[in-house]
Amino acid sequence: MANLQERKSFSKPRISIQASGGTPEAKGIEKRKLSQKRRTLPLQLSLGGHLSPWPTYTSGQTVLHNRKPCSDDSRNRANSCQQQSMSISKPKYLEQLENYLRKELLLLDLSTDSAQELRLQPYREIFEFFIEDFKTYKPLLSSIKNAYEVMLAHQKERIRSLEPLKAKIVTMNEDCSERVLAMRAEERYEISVLKKEKMNLLKLIDKKNEEKISLQSEVAKLRRSLAEEYLRYLTERDARKILIGDLNELRYQQEDMSLAQTPGVWGEDPVKLTLALKMTRQDLTRTQMELNTMKANSGDVVPRRDLEMQEKTNMELQEQLESLKADYEEVQKEHELLLQLHMSTLKERDQFYNELQEIQRTSTPRPDWTKCESIIAGGPERWLVLAEGKNSDQLVDVLLEEIGMGLLREKDFFPGLGFGDAIPPFLRFDGPVKNKKPSKKEVVNLLKDAWKERIAEEQKEPFPDFFFNFLERRFGVNDAMAWAYTIFENIKLFRSSEIMNQFYAVLMGKNLESVYINQKKTLSHLLKELLSVDTQNEGSITMEQFSTILKTTFPLKKEEQIQELMEAVGWGPDSSNTDMLNYRSLFNEDEEGQSEPFVQRLWEQYESDKEAYLEELKQELDLDPLEDVTLLKMRGTLMNIDPTMDKQTLSAYLSQAYQIPAIDVPLEDEEKQGIISIKVETALDRLRMADTKRVGPREPDPAS
């Protein structure tokens, strides 16, 4: 009966808790019922009673004295201690709480959705009992319980807020699965259609091959029959000639026989012959008289052939005279123009002379660059290397780079630029950034590796994002920002280095990366052409071969530009075309990434050709730089100055100028082309950023 009463007293609060819900009133009811349940607990114990400190009260009894491990006394004492410890039971209050927890857990219905919350309720009650019984620790235990309750409530709210997101994810997962299945079905259908088409084409190819074989056999048969007919006709022709010769011989023999048999041919009448002779002599006399008369009358007459020849000569001389008159008039005009030009040149000379005098009077003297030898690291030898072939402006840049490099070495940290929109993405950081202090060679090698990885990647991201991701992959997430600031400061400083200058221009959006990539492709193509000429793989070719390859590889370059490239490789006026050239050394780079003069000259010509092309485009547009130019007018102007441009290149130029995708450029819709417009200056700046160059000559060859 006591057990039954205890079971009822323990189960009653559980039912009331399930029905109460989560409202504040229900929580109050739950608290009151907990207090009632506490009163109904059998064999109540409180801190005022004697709570057993189990199992600590036996610790003093289990201490063993120092004994020999093999002695009988120690063995007996150990056995007695073990029996004593096994006979010790748990405190009554602990057993009651464990029995209550076990019964409550058995009575729970764990099949509902809130099974875990119900399972937690008995543990709450046990904890409440501890809080009420241990008065000394009640504030601490209450704060612990409240902290856990707050955290559980927060987690429940968070789970409740994430339930719609979970349902949405499930729905999206189902939609994506359906779309994937549909795409796979469509791909399977397309694959089956393509397979059928492939089989049909294979059958058609087999049929055509059979027809080809039959036709070839028929042609061979016809050739044999034609040869036989030709031989037969040759034989018939020869036989016919022989037969005709025999017939002619027979006819001649027959005529001779008929003449010999005809009487009177050889026996002509002498009277008739005398009369005929007399008449013939009279005709001869008359003809002689007429001939003499004609000679007398035609003594002073010029032959017609001579007359025609003289007339022809006269016409040629007349034409030469007219052409000489025209040349004389043209030369006279040119002489007048030259006189005017000479006068204007004299005026300009006087003006420039006066300006020179004024500049010499007011300007400072030319700087003595030898003073920099003692300041630059490396002494006079390094300064001579740096200053070789450079003008004053370039020497100022070199001096600034050397000074900046020293200041850059002294910096241990860079100030962070913040997170503003004007800050590049790879420099957005707040706080000091460590200066890694790499050498110029290390920076150049790092930029080369970045270019190699950029060219090799398939899915292209924006170049600044790629640059920062590359640094993360190379140096890790923690050091990527420090390297980004370090490399940025170095490439911003060393403008005389080609690879640093080009990388800085692409990184800051001043140039597209296609400019650098196409330049490398051009050099690779030129090297391949040179290797194709070097059949012996000796590494050297003649100057004549080098000049020919330059003209074929760069057909749009003028003769003066080809001459500049020849001079850049060491060809001079005294050199002969048979001199040998080590062409592989033209593409070498030093440890700081500096190219040979030949590659530098190629890049300078590329920049000048681009500027000339854009200037020609600007002149052809004939608009103010701040005026708007429509896509239709830009398209027509590009076709006028570059008639051989293909549609793909034209679409790419228009896409770059108007910042629209190349596939959306309306080349065929003139109405849309007339709507899209942009300022001339903006369009030219955007084309200057890209790999813009002439595709063909201004006036194409009529034969092509």
Curated annotation (Swiss-Prot):
Specifically expressed in testes. Predominantly detected in the post-meiotic stages of germ cells. It holds the Pfam family TSNAXIP1_N. The keyword Coiled coil applies. Residues 190-230, 304-342 form a coiled coil. Residues 1-37 are annotated as: Disordered. InterPro entries: TSNAXIP1_N. Interacts with TSNAX. This is Translin-associated factor X-interacting protein 1. It comes from Mus musculus. The lineage of its organism: Eukaryota, Metazoa, Chordata, Craniata, Vertebrata. The gene is Tsnaxip1.
